[in-house]
Amino acid sequence: TDKTIPEANVYFIGFCVHRGSCSMEVSDFLSDLSGKQIALFGTCGMGDSPEYYKDIAGRVSAWIEADNDYLGYFICQGKMPQKVRMKYESMRTDENNDQIDRFIQNFDLALTHPDDLDVEHAKVFVDHMLKKIQL
């Protein structure tokens, strides 16, 4: 990022999932941190899958250097740009019709996310992280 980020002991790093990970800006920022406590949170358009979210968190947390204290992660479903739905529709063939239907159904369900329940879960995550933080 071009912006100066204030020095802190604890960082809550947010990101939107893109192709199963975070942006290069986020990964660069994470890899530059040293001696910090770090919690990750993000949104993911590709459905509500705890297993997939765990995989994403593993890929993103891999950028955190070993001298940091990785506190944990929270990922919830997030909405996607309309161009994603249009791409799905343009990819449809007789062979992948059912798969594209599932992608579009997920896209439509994601339009309301993050929702109130996601926000409540995020609050629980933050409370849990605050208990882990060593100031």
Labelled PLM ranges:
Residues 1-4:
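A short, well-structured beta->alpha microelement
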Residues 7-135:
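FMN-binding flavodoxin-like domain, especially the glycine-rich phosphate-binding loop
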